[in-house]
């Protein structure tokens, strides 16, 4: 299967690392903004074609699908472009930064009949899969999720510490992970959702601190704290408080409430959530089925984000 990866930055390269471990998939073209860095990344991964034009990449012989790891503000437009070209698409989280654009992506997916998937990685991290499997088996019920998403980003840098050409967003990007995961793990949509935000950064023009509270009909609650001001370990730290144990998840690692590490061997074929996410995308294409984290399945998360956005009076997007 020949695919296009759009985005030569930190996250695009995470996808390229994962795809390199998946048999039967070849990256036919890499799309990037800065052509010098795009050329270098293409050479590093042995990709035969690179370009700054998504349409040119999609037109390469045999291309069936595209993975978009481009700036958030480009996701909706590029996603529609890929689908209207008759190609399957996986869009990194968030698929859009408005509910209207997310709804449009789903409408275009239904119209074209291609597969459309969001890069909701937390559904695929072995740590969260372990919890989900126990929930599905009736062995566990989430009572509360306590989550902290922390970075130190007072300048516009990406996950690799390089200058970023776009501005990240606590609500529409980082909160999207936890909002979706909370609703996925409880199997319900939040009926109570409130958010507050701290001051805007004078240059970045986005909130640097945010707090979110959610509740689903079965009574489970979620407390989410987010910050770009935290001078410490970065990433998202999840505490699952359940009826039958407490669990601490950090990316692909899991421990119990007393910090005893849990062996995740056998949960999935890899310990890399990005790779597992991409495996699901390619499997759905081959098997002609709806993927986990399809545009339809993630729309409830986008609706909750829209509710939270309105609760804060419409948080500015850079």
Q: Residue ranges of each PLM-predicted region?
A:
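N-terminal Rossmann-like dinucleotide-binding module
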Residues: 1-45
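Active-site loop of classical SDR/Rossmann-like NAD(P)-dependent oxidoreductases
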Residues: 33, 267-279, 293
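Beta-loop-alpha module in the N-terminal Rossmann-like domain of NAD(P)-dependent dehydrogenases
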Residues: 45-108
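Hydrophobic residues in well-ordered beta-strands that form the structural core
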Residues: 51, 91, 116-118, 249
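C-terminal helix-rich "cap/oligomerization" subdomain common to oxidoreductases
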Residues: 65-68, 217, 281-318
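Rossmann-fold dehydrogenase core element
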Residues: 104-121, 140-145
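Predominantly a Rossmann-like dinucleotide-binding segment in NAD(P)-dependent oxidoreductases
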Residues: 122-196, 201-202
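Contiguous beta-strand/loop segments that form the cofactor/metal-binding neighborhood of enzyme cores
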Residues: 173, 179-253, 279-289
